[in-house]
A protein has these predicted regions:
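Hydrophobic alpha-helical transmembrane segments of polytopic
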Residues: 22-25, 107-114, 118, 148-155, ...
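Transmembrane helix-loop junctions at the membrane interface of multipass transporters and ion channels
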Residues: 35, 40-57, 119-136, 322-326
Length: 327
C-alpha cells in the first residue's frame, strides 16, 4: 500500500501500464511477504500458532528466490517487448514530478513512527501470552489480541490526525478503494464460515475427498498435494483461514511441523502465500491495489481477465516448483 501510488506515478507517462500493476500484485502484494510472519497473514497465523518468527526465512528462501527470479525475468521480457515497440511515451502529459517543484522531501514522516508501532503491536500479539481469555458471544477473545486491535485502531486515528492534508492530497488519496475492499471482504468473511467449518470437519465432512488426498494410504503427508490443495483453496477462500485449516490437517503441532514435518509446513506456507496471487480475492491487498490503480484511471483486468494473467504466468512456475521442492 505504501508503494503502489509512487509506482503508478512513476509509470503514468507510459502507454502500457497494466502489466506493471499485475506483476506488482504477484511480487510485492504476495511473493514479497514470504519470508516473515509480518509479510503475509497466513504466516502471521502460523506465528500465533507457535511457528518460530524466522522459521519461514530459513525454510522458504529457496522457493522465494525462485519465485522472485522467474517473475522478474518474465516481467523484464514483457516490459522490454513494449519498450521495443517504440510507442510507450504518451504525448503531452504533464510531468507529475517537475524538477522546478523544489528539493526532494518527505511529508508525513511521523507515519514511519506509527508504522513501527504497528509492527510492534503485531509482534506483541504473537510473543506476549498472558493466558487471559474473554468470551464474546461464544467466541474466545485473547487479551493480547484485544490490546493489538485497540492499538491498531488508535494508531490509525493518530495517523489521520498527525498527517498533513497536503501529503494525502499529493498522493491522490481517497477512501473509495478502502471502502470497496472492506465491503467485499466483509461479505467474503461472513460467507466463508460454513466452508471453513466443512473443511475443518476433515474426513468426516463434505470435503473428505480433498482431505484424504493430502495424505497417502499409510497416513504420511503428500507434500505436492498439500501444496496444490492449500494453494487452490487459498485462491478463492482467502489464504489466511485456508492456511490454518491445512496447518491443523497436518497435525497442528508447530514443534513437530517445524522439525520432522518441515517439508509439509513449507508446502502449506508457500502455497498460501504464493497462490494467494491467483485471484483478486486470494489476498486482500490484491483487490486494494486494483482499486487504487483504477481510482487513478488505469484500466485493470476483470476478475477472470486477471486469472488469465495468473494462469499464464504463475501456474507454470507452481508446476516447476512442485517438481523442484515438493515431490
Amino acid at each position: 500500500m505504501l508503494l503502489i501510488r509512487p509506482l503508478l506515478r512513476a509509470n503514468e507517462a507510459r502507454r502500457h501500464r497494466t502489466h506493471v500493476v499485475v506483476f506488482f500484485i504477484f511480487l510485492v502484494a504476495n511473493a514479497g511477504g514470504a519470508l516473515t510472519p509480518l509479510g503475509d497473514p497466513p504466516l502471521f497465523l502460523g506465528f500465533l500458532q507457535g511457528v518460530d518468527f524466522f522459521w519461514t526465512a530459513g525454510n522458504l528462501w529457496r522457493e522465494t528466490l525462485m519465485m522472485w527470479g522467474l517473475l522478474l525475468a518474465v516481467f523484464f521480457a514483457i516490459d522490454s517487448y513494449y519498450d521495443r515497440l517504440g510507442r510507450e511515451a504518451l504525448p503531452d502529459l504533464t510531468d507529475a514530478t517537475p524538477d522546478a517543484a523544489g528539493p526532494l522531501r518527505i511529508e508525513g514522516r511521523v507515519n514511519f513512527v506509527l508504522l513501527a508501532g504497528i509492527l510492534g503491536l503485531v509482534l506483541m500479539s504473537g510473543l506476549w501470552k498472558p493466558g487471559i481469555v474473554f468470551h464474546v458471544m461464544g467466541t474466545e477473545v485473547l487479551l493480547q489480541n484485544v490490546v493489538r486491535d485497540a492499538g491498531l485502531v488508535a494508531l490509525a486515528f493518530a495517523s489521520l490526525w498527525l498527517t498533513p492534508a497536503t501529503a494525502r492530497a499529493g498522493n491522490a488519496f481517497n477512501w473509495a478503494p478502502i471502502l470497496e475492499v472492506a465491503k467485499l471482504f466483509a461479505g467474503i468473511f461472513i460467507t466463508i464460515g460454513p466452508v471453513i467449518a466443512m473443511l475443518k470437519a476433515g474426513v468426516d465432512g463434505p470435503f473428505a475427498a480433498i482431505v484424504r488426498l493430502v495424505n497417502d494410504s499409510a497416513g504420511q503427508p503428500n507434500n505436492a498435494m498439500y501444496f496444490w490443495a492449500t494453494g487452490l483453496l487459498s485462491s478463492f477462500l482467502d489464504n489466511a483461514p485456508t492456511y490454518l485449516v491445512f496447518f491443523n490437517t497436518a497435525g497442528g503441532d508447530a514443534r513437530m511441523l517445524m522439525t520432522e514435518g518441515a517439508s509439509t509446513l513449507a508446502a502449506i506456507s508457500a502455497a498460501a502465500v504464493f497462490m494467494g496471487a491467483n485471484t483478486y480475492i486470494g489476498n486482500a491487498p490484491n483487490l486494494m491495489v486494483k482499486a487504487i490503480a483504477e481510482s487513478r484511471g488505469l484500466r485493470m483486468p476483470s476478475f477472470f481477465g486477471y486469472m488469465l494473467w495468473s494462469g499464464a504466468v504463475l501456474v507454470p512456475i507452481f508446476v516447476l516448483m512442485t517438481f523442484v521442492f515438493f515431490r
